[in-house]
Regions:
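N-terminal binding-site loop/beta-alpha segment at the start of enzyme catalytic domains
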Residues: 1-86, 122, 150
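Terminal-tail/helix-coil boundary detector
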Residues: 2-9, 207-208, 231-274, 289-293, ...
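Generic structural signal for well-ordered alpha-helices
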Residues: 11, 45, 68, 72-75, ...
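Conserved, mostly hydrophobic/aromatic
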Residues: 14, 26, 56, 71, ...
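A cross-family glycoside hydrolase active-site/sugar-binding cleft signature
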Residues: 25-29, 59, 88-90, 127-130, ...
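Glycine/proline-rich, positively charged
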Residues: 35, 50, 94-196, 200
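Glycine-rich beta-alpha junction loops
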Residues: 91, 163, 189-193, 216-227, ...
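Aromatic-lined glycan-binding groove of carbohydrate-active enzymes
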Residues: 196-244, 278
C-alpha cells in the first residue's frame, strides 16, 4: 500500500535548484494551537511519508521549539531515512530574549543550531528567514545564511513572505559577494489569497526562477467545507483557538462578505460533487495545478485529512479549462495586474498561463 501511494506522488524542482520536493508537504504549525495533539500529528506525518511526501516543514516559533521536537521524534519513531527527507526550518523568533529574535548573524546561526538540536539532526535541507527584518543590514543577513551552508548546517536557504524587491536586493548582494542565493519563498496561496503567487512574485519567478513553498492552501480550513453555512463548528480550528479565529475568520469571513462567501462555497461544493471529490480536495488541487507552486504545505490532525489531501492529486489530473473558468467566476478575486507601459494596458493575468492541464500524478515536473 505504501509503495503504491508513493508512486502517485508528484515531485517538482524547488526553484532554480536540483532539489526535488513532493508537491505536497506537511508542516508543524498546528503545535501553536493544539499542543495536546502531538501523537496525532506524528501519525499524520507518517501517513504523509508513506504517501510519498518528502518535505517536512517546521519553525523555531512553532510551539517555541515543540514543532521541531515533534518532527524530530517522528523521524526517530518511524525510522525514516534521512536522505529521503527534505527538512525545512524557519528562523526569526524563539523567545522574548533580545538576542533570540530577528535576522542578526547571531540569531540566524544560533537559532538554526538550536532547531537542529531540537530535531536531533546534524543539518537541515532548507533554512528560511521566516520574516523580513528591516532593522538588520541585509548584507549581514545574507552572509549569515550563506555561512550556514558553507559550514554544513543547511543545504539551501530561502525566504518567507519577503517582498519581491527585498528578494531581488538579497540576490544582488549574493551575486556581488559570491554568496549562496536564496531559492524560494514561503508565501500564502489559496483561493482566497492570490496576490503573492499570481501577481507580486511575477518578476521574481521570471528573473530568478524562484520557487515557492506555499502555505494555508485551505485558508486555515475555511475552504474545507466545514464553514459553508457561515458558522464556526466547535471542533474546527477557529472553534478551538481564539488566536486562530482572529487570524483567519475576521479577515476572510467578515460580516461584509460572509454572504458572498457562502454563495461561493456553495458553488465550489457543486463542482466538487461533480468531480466526486471533497471541497477540500478541490481547493488543494486548485493550488497544485499552478506550476508556480513548487510544494504546498498542509496541516493535519487526522490521518483521514492526509488521505484526502493526497487524493487532491487525482483531482488535479482531471483539471480542465472549463473547471478553471467556473472556479474563477465563482471566486471573483483575480488579482488586479500592474500596467504594462509599452501597451498602457494591464499585464495579462499570470495564472491562466501557469495552470497545468496535463497534470500526471507520480511524475517529476520540470
Amino acid at each position: 500500500m505504501a509503495e503504491e501511494s508513493k508512486s502517485k506522488m508528484t515531485y517538482r524542482y524547488l526553484g532554480n535548484s536540483g532539489l526535488k520536493v513532493s508537491v505536497l508537504a506537511i508542516g508543524t504549525m498546528l503545535t501553536n494551537y493544539y499542543k495536546k495533539d502531538v501523537e496525532a500529528w506524528m501519525e499524520c506525518a507518517n501517513a504523509a511519508y508513506e504517501a510519498g511526501v518528502n518535505y517536512f516543514d517546521t519553525a523555531e516559533i512553532y510551539g517555541m521549539g515543540d514543532g521541531d521536537k515533534m518532527l524530530g521524534e517522528s523521524i526517530k519513531k518511524y525510522g525514516w531515512k534521512r536522505d529521503n527527507l527534505v527538512i525545512s526550518v524557519k528562523i526569526f523568533s524563539s523567545s522574548p530574549a533580545p538576542t533570540h529574535n530577528f535576522m542578526s548573524r547571531k540569531h540566524i546561526i544560533e537559532g538554526t543550531k538550536e532547531s537542529l538540536k531540537n530535531l536531533g539532526l546534524d543539518y537541515c535541507d532548507l533554512v528560511f528567514s521566516h520574516r523580513p527584518d528591516y532593522q538588520t543590514p541585509l548584507e549581514e543577513t545574507v552572509r549569515a545564511f550563506s555561512w550556514l551552508i558553507d559550514h554544513g548546517y543547511a543545504k539551501y536557504w530561502c525566504t518567507s513572505t519577503w517582498p519581491p524587491a527585498l528578494i531581488s536586493d538579497a540576490i544582488g548582494i549574493c551575486e556581488e559577494l559570491g554568496l549562496h542565493k536564496p531559492i524560494a519563498d514561503q508565501c500564502q496561496y489559496n483561493m482566497l489569497s492570490r496576490n503573492d503567487v499570481e501577481r507580486d512574485y511575477m518578476n521574481t519567478f521570471e528573473s530568478h526562477k524562484y520557487g515557492t513553498t506555499v502555505w494555508s492552501p485551505l485558508a486555515g480550513g475555511l475552504l474545507s467545507g466545514k464553514y459553508n453555512d457561515g458558522n464556526i463548528p466547535e471542533d474546527s480550528r477557529c472553534g478551538k483557538s481564539e488566536a486562530f479565529k482572529g487570524m483567519m475568520w475576521g479577515p476572510m469571513m467578515g460580516d461584509d462578505i460572509i454572504e458572498q462567501r457562502k454563495k461561493m462555497f456553495s458553488g465550489l461544493k457543486e463542482i466538487a460533487d461533480e468531480l466526486s471529490c471533497t471541497q477540500a480536495e478541490l481547493a488543494l488541487a486548485w493550488v497544485i495545478v499552478n506550476k508556480d507552486v513548487s510544494t504546498c504545505i498542509f496541516g493535519a490532525s487526522k490521518i483521514s485529512q492526509v488521505d484526502s489531501n493526497v487524493k487532491a492529486l487525482e483531482v488535479a489530473e482531471k483539471w480542465t479549462p472549463e473547471i478553471e473558468e467556473r472556479i474563477n467566476n465563482l471566486l471573483k478575486n483575480e488579482p488586479e495586474m500592474p500596467v504594462h507601459y509599452r501597451t498602457f494596458a494591464p499585464w495579462p493575468a499570470r495564472r491562466p498561463t501557469r495552470v497545468n492541464y496535463d497534470f500526471k500524478a507520480g511524475v517529476l515536473e520540470q
